[in-house]
């Protein structure tokens, strides 16, 4: 079965480099990612754009818009990009210039969507500062991907990353599709309700375990941990709106795919691992066709 990994990273972020070395034990490079893709029948990935101007500064308030995948000079052919947004630069005298650069980037064929780092940046997703970004998403028919749940930085504020904030946003912006990252973990039941209630809200299952095989074995063999997520999936009962992602380099792709296969009932595997990505990200069809 072909797989589309809709949530990976390929940015020069210090914490990602350290995680790859110390925890997940992966080769954090385009070549390393491609090798894992080939080994696991992953035909396409979507990278979440993010940058830091100073080593260790993520989430960096000084990063210009849009934030991209800067570990390599250009986006590899087997990837697409969700352009990252720094809301701190969307106000003031230079806001229009920032928005103009975002819009120009959205016209690139390798761009699949927009990424908001809620919690990392201290703005609610329904804050008016993001309104022009949602207007661009509607104009170019791309989804907005939103970090929710625990932040991979002590400088994040969790109140901005709670999945219930997406409920108000989805109501305000019915013309835009949104994806809740990480199923809102640890607030997975809240995220499940937001997905079930709102026709324009999806969720990914990325980033729920970080580390190498011993980490995965520990958690996959803990019923309380697995049932934490299964309960939310069963409650939502919208497997057509759940998408596979790994959050690589936070975990090896083979281990993460095994984990999600255990979480999701087998009859829904093809939807979650492959088909649902086409529904949420309209541009991936052309990207895959271009790969031949």
Where are the language model's segments positioned?
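Divalent metal-dependent hydrolysis catalytic cores, especially in the metallo-beta-lactamase
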Residues: 24-57, 78-86, 112-113, 118-119, ...
């Amino acid at each position: 079965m072909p797989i589309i990994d809709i949530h990976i990273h390929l940015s020069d972020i210090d914490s990602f480099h350290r995680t790859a070395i110390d925890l997940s034990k992966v080769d954090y490079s385009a070549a390393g990612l491609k090798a894992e893709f080939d080994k696991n029948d992953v035909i396409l990935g979507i990278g979440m754009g993010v940058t830091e101007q100073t080593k260790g500064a993520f989430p960096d308030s000084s990063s210009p818009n849009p934030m991209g995948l800067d570990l390599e000079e250009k986006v590899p052919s087997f990837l697409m990009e969700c352009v990252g947004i720094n809301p701190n630069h969307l106000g003031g005298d230079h806001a229009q210039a920032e928005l103009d650069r975002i819009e120009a980037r959205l016209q690139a064929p390798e761009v699949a969507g927009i990424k908001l780092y809620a919690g990392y940046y201290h703005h609610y997703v329904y804050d008016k500062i993001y309104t022009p970004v949602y207007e661009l998403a509607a104009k170019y028919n791309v989804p907005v991907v939103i970090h929710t749940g625990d932040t991979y930085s002590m400088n994040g504020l969790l109140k901005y990353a709670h999945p219930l904030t997406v409920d108000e946003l989805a109501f305000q912006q019915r013309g835009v599709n949104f994806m809740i990252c990480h199923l809102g973990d640890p607030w997975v039941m809240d995220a499940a309700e937001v997905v079930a209630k709102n026709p324009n809200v999806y969720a990914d299952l990325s980033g729920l375990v970080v580390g190498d095989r011993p980490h995965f074995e520990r958690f996959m063999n803990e019923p309380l941990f697995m049932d934490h997520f299964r309960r939310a999936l069963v409650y939502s009962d919208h497997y057509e709106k759940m998408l596979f992602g790994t959050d690589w380099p936070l975990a090896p792709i083979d281990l993460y795919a095994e984990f999600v296969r255990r979480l999701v009932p087998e009859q829904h595997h093809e939807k979650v691992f492959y088909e649902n990505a086409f529904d949420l990200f309209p541009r991936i069809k052309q990207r895959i066709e271009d790969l031949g």
